[in-house]
Amino acid sequence: MAIFGLQIVISLIVFCFLTKLTKYYSFGRWLLCKGLYHYWPPTNEEFKQAIKQRYAKESNNKSKKQSNILKSYHKTSTINNNNDSSNTKEEFPIPIDTSIELKLIPVTHQDVIQVKYIDEFFSLVDFITGSIIIFILTELYLYIMPIIRQNNEHLNEINLSLFWCFISLLLALIILTKFVREYLKVDEGILCILFGALSFLLALCLQYIDEKFFDFNLKQTYGNHSIIYNDDNDEEINYIDRRFIYIVMLLSLINAYQTIILFFPAFRFGQLQYLFLLKNKNLNKKNFKNIFIFILIIINFILPIFTCLLWFKPIIQHININYLIKLKILSIIICILLRICLFKFYIQIYLDTAYDRVKILYEQQQLTTTRITNLSYQRNVTSIFFYLGVVTSQYILPVFIELIICFYLKIFSFKNSNLSINSLKPPKWLQNFDNYMTNTTNTNSSLILTWNDLHTFFNNQHITVLLSYVLFWHHTIFCLISCGSLIYNTYIQREQHITVKND
């Protein structure tokens, strides 16, 4: 209690409260199960009814052909009904001019609980939300208590929110790694490995030119130079400590891992951005709400690109270091909040792709001799909904990871390297409260000394440089891949349009 003080009480109370609250109100359920709609295909009976209505509209001179076709449908239907005992699914072709309407129904919790990875999404979003609340309360506590105690020094406490943020970060990385493992089972996994290897080489290049163009300060912090003169003592030769090379290799491996887990989330984000631009282009009615959302989504995509420029030395060379760190954290948090606020719009754009898939099916049927069956129709529509757990996790988890890295950067950037052991005496009533909570703070002062020794060996500057570099890579690689995805989808759509026009 002497190390964590009142923080552990706040943490336990908040988590107990949130555990009880999630039964009635969940931030994850609110994000996904309120205000969103998804398409659902007709049943087999509705398909048959639509086919009958289609043939009933034909002329009388084709009545014989109609009866033969209807008999064939009834025949296949009876055969498949007889085979239902052997667990075979009923399948029949659908004519191209059959009038079929997709059902647009709201997304409910009862529907999404059968979706894969949706339980992980709900539990992880709620846990990370609790960790964020604990971090904010802890920061308020550590800011207010020195004012109450009439002491400007830091408290004799270790920030407990670091522990909860670390657990949240670890769980998010586990889920994204699980997605990569699923991709590796198919051909798409090769892209993750390829871009991971390219990012490893790119990270090596960036870390060796950081002093000229980038504000990483890796060489200044970890690169101990040794000056050796040649035989004539007229020329100096600088050698960098070997430990710096090990750190460079370790950071490059971390960057490669970041790229691997962020490739498909960033690529999908760029794809959703393209779908939104395409939808807005074809939108006939444009009111104030649509224009406002369009501006927000454009800002959401462009603002992170300008945030990456805060690590370029030619731009920030005249800015104070403390203000620069605050500006980096503030700008990234604005990007994160904007992306969370636009969560429903992006997910709704994804759910609307079920309607586009049906249009593509009919276009393929017109160009080729393949025929649409009821199973292929249903499969193309329902696959969008059943992949919702992966899409939502890929959208929200990189945002939370970046937010947690910002929290760590804030804690280690604006904090003294040593924790004070002897501080000024607070007021009597507050001192009695402290004695009751901590049972005298001197009992565990040896642990605080150990914490201070660790800080002298590996101080806040070392940690801040690492966190700033990891944050830069996470933010920049996500922007680069999403921009590449937007360009790729635009090019593919243009090529398909040219091909259809030529045909």
Residue positions per predicted region:
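Alpha-helical transmembrane segments of secretory-pathway, organelle, and plasma-membrane proteins
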Residues: 1-44, 97-183, 187, 191-503
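Membrane-interface amphipathic/juxtamembrane segments adjacent to transmembrane helices
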Residues: 26-75
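Short, non-transmembrane cytosolic segments of multipass membrane proteins
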Residues: 68-88
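Charge-dense, helix-prone N-terminal extensions
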Residues: 88-98
